[in-house]
UniProtKB/Swiss-Prot annotation:
One of its GO terms (molecular function) is structural constituent of ribosome. This is Small ribosomal subunit protein bS16. The keyword Coiled coil does not apply. Residues 104-118 have a biased composition (Basic and acidic residues). Pfam families: Ribosomal_S16 (PF00886). Belongs to the bacterial ribosomal protein bS16 family. The gene is rpsP.
Length: 137
């Protein structure tokens, strides 16, 4: 059985994101997979790349062939270099900077008004109406 490591496309039109999967080479692009080993979001800035290194190394060691795109991603994460024997392979994936935490200004503290309970309709007002209808009948 020929096994490939390739990209499975998800997302909307013009907004793709991919899963890095291990699948039989004869299956459809988005068909049945053996295992999902990572994610790739090319539309984010910088691109989001996440690969489970242990699983990628395992599948490469048992003969799975990566496609050109996946091979490029594995080179970025350093997994391809480790597979080829380079013990010092390092990930060159850029990571998004964390957003600073939002701190609310104490002077502009929002004012919360307590909710007022709606008064129940007075039973006295409803009772005379009921009596008047009985008198008319």
């Amino acid at each position: 059985m020929a096994v490939k490591i390739r990209l499975k496309r998800l997302g909307k039109i013009r907004a793709p994101y991919y899963r890095i999967v291990v699948a039989d080479s004869r299956t459809k692009r988005d068909g049945r997979v053996i295992e999902e080993i990572g994610k790739y979001h090319p539309t984010e800035e910088p691109s989001f790349i996440e690969v489970q290194s242990e699983r990628a190394q395992y599948w490469l060691s048992v003969g799975a062939q990566p496609t050109e795109q996946v091979e490029a991603l594995l080179k970025l994460t350093g997994d391809w270099g480790r597979f080829k024997g380079d013990k010092d392979a390092v990930s060159t994936v850029r990571v998004r900077e964390a957003k600073p935490a939002y701190v609310a200004d104490e002077k502009k503290k929002p004012v919360l008004k307590p909710k007022t309970e709606k008064a129940a309709p007075a039973p006295e007002a409803a009772a005379p109406e009921a009596e008047s209808t009985e008198e008319q009948a």
